[in-house]
Structures are given as structure tokens and as C-alpha cells.
Amino acid sequence: MVREGEERIGNRVSLGVIGVSYRETTLQQREQVLHILQQAQGSFRPEVFQEERDYVLLATCHRVELYSVAPAELFDSLAQEIELLGVSPYFYRNQDCFAHLFCVAGGLDSLVLGETEIQGQVKRAYLQAAREQKLSFALHFLFQKALKEGKVFRAKGGAPYAEITIPILVDQELRRRQIDKKASLLFIGYSEINRSVAYHLQRQGFSCITFCSRQQLPTLSMRQVVREELCFQDPYRVVFLGSSELQYALPHSLWESIWDIPDRIVFDFAVPRALPSHTVFPHRYVDMDQISDWLREHRKEVNSAHLHSLREVAYRYWNSLNQRLERRDCVGANA
């Protein structure tokens, strides 16, 4: 649903994004920034800025961003709070906000250059915000067009092929640790990253893969166990954690036994991490910080022509948005 009576985007109010990514921050810092942005929801209440403000929170393994149509002082206050962590967030407004999200959705701003997962992550963040709030026309327009053009950009071959991906890196790490392909692998959470890793490992010959989720998944071809039946005493050689909510969804007594199997390896794909850092065995635990370091070693440079072409598309949509808002103002004034 689109908000009525939306305020014009201008000098006082910006369509903007504030956030951090793998470039500026460690995983721990991104977790802290995510907490700040989640707590900032109170800043969007009417008693703070005289009217309700809408926003979209995008949180992935490698970035945490908040998009909103809001006064400059709101973005400034968030930036100041984030800077207290020793982090310098980026802030893009209006046409630069458009250009940024278009490049994100197109995979050109990803650590895994050209990855496709980010398209789904952006879409889910947008749809969740649309379910929970009455989003402004500007935010609807921004996300719908970024998702559309990201898809078109890939279809035309603009996005580079991602030669090194997280599933490939996980496969390489299992080989390095000499994990047998008959070893029992457990994936907790039916997240996109868990699915992509599981199906890749299955294609590589790993034959004993189990998924654990809230309920049975009728279309899943792999073994399944529901959360109520999960037991870390079972001989899972490798455990993959695909959701940050697992830390609170599973009982503490269960987590205490996750390291009981000698030499068990745990991959924690969640942001925030599913396992607190003080509870892990470092030589048996891999989180997104380590994976990010591996990806940086293999990252390709962005093709400047691809970047320029996608930004130009974004700028055209920004101009189109302003024209639409002006027409709405004229209709409202003449009503």
C-alpha cells in the first residue's frame, strides 16, 4: 500500500540509504550496525518527526543498509551513532541512492561479483517492509525498478559470471580438511545460502545431507529432521547454520552439545552470527568474516562500462520519479 499525502523529495527530505558493507567493516561491526538500525525504528514514529516515516532494512552477509524517505537530520543522527563504533558509514541520497541500489541488485557491488543471491535478498527485504508498513510511492518505485533492471542487466549478460562463490569456497575448505564425501552434513535453516551450498555439495558427490527446519518440506529431495528432533549427539561431521534466529530458536541445552563430536566443523553463515564468538572453537568454526577474506583474494574488478551503464539507467528512473511526483502535486493542487 502506498502512503497518501507524501511529502515532496527536496532539500529537507531525501530518498536516501545509509549503511556499511564488507568494504568498511568486519562481521562484528556489521552486527553492531544492524542492531543500531533495528533500534532506530523508534526514530520513525510520528512523535519524533511529526509524521510516520517508512523504511526498508536490507541485511545480508556482506551489507547492512537502511533506505528511507526522511529528513537529513535522521540520517545524520544514525551516521553519528554508527561512527561511535569506529566505522564510517556511507550515505547516498536521491539519484545516488538510485544508482547504489541498482548496482547492488545487479550484483556489481557484491563481494562475489555478479552473484545472483543478492537479487532475492533485496526482493525479500522490500516485500517484508511492504507487508509491515505503508511504504511511500518513492520507495516502491525505487525497489521495483531496481529489481526489474537488475534482472534485465543479468539477462543481457551485463553481470559478470561469478567464478568463485561461497558454495565453491565451502567445497574447497571441506577438501582441504579432507572431509569424506560420505560424511554426514547437517544444514540448519532452509535459507538461500544453505540451499545453494547443499545442492552444490550434492553435485560434487556428498551423499549424506540432512536439512533441519521448522517443519517438513515436501519438495525437498534430501533427508529432513524437524527442530524438535534435532540432536547434536548424532554424528554430523559438518554443521551449517543458515539463520541468525537459530541462536534463540533452539534451546541453550542443545547448543551446549554442538562441539561434543570430536573434529566437528561448523560453518556459520548468519549475520548476526548464530553462535556467539566466545562459545566457539576457532579451529573448528568458520564464519562470514573468514569467508569474506577468502572471497577478497579472488574478487574480480568491476567493469567500469557495466557500472556506468547501470548507473545511467538508475539516473533515468530518478528523473522519471521526480516527474511523476510533480504531476501528482499538480493534480493535488488543482483538486
Swiss-Prot record:
The active site is at residue 61. GO terms for biological process: protoporphyrinogen IX biosynthetic process. It is an enzyme of class 1 (oxidoreductase). One of its GO terms (molecular function) is NADP binding. NADP(+) binds at residues 189-194. The keyword Oxidoreductase applies. It catalyses: (S)-4-amino-5-oxopentanoate + tRNA(Glu) + NADP(+) = L-glutamyl-tRNA(Glu) + NADPH + H(+). The record marks 100 as: Important for activity. Keywords: NADP, Oxidoreductase, Porphyrin biosynthesis. Pfam families: GlutR_N (PF05201). Its EC number is 1.2.1.70. Pathway: Porphyrin-containing compound metabolism; protoporphyrin-IX biosynthesis; 5-aminolevulinate from L-glutamyl-tRNA(Glu): step 1/2. Substrate binds at residues 60-63, 110, 115-117, 121. The keyword NADP applies. Belongs to the glutamyl-tRNA reductase family. HAMAP family: Glu_tRNA_reductase (MF_00087). Catalyzes the NADPH-dependent reduction of glutamyl-tRNA(Glu) to glutamate 1-semialdehyde (GSA). During catalysis, the active site Cys acts as a nucleophile attacking the alpha-carbonyl group of tRNA-bound glutamate with the formation of a thioester intermediate between enzyme and glutamate, and the concomitant release of tRNA(Glu). The thioester intermediate is finally reduced by direct hydride transfer from NADPH, to form the product GSA. Possesses an unusual extended V-shaped dimeric structure with each monomer consisting of three distinct domains arranged along a curved 'spinal' alpha-helix. The N-terminal catalytic domain specifically recognizes the glutamate moiety of the substrate. The second domain is the NADPH-binding domain, and the third C-terminal domain is responsible for dimerization. Homodimer. This is Glutamyl-tRNA reductase. It comes from Chlamydia trachomatis serovar D (strain ATCC VR-885 / DSM 19411 / UW-3/Cx).
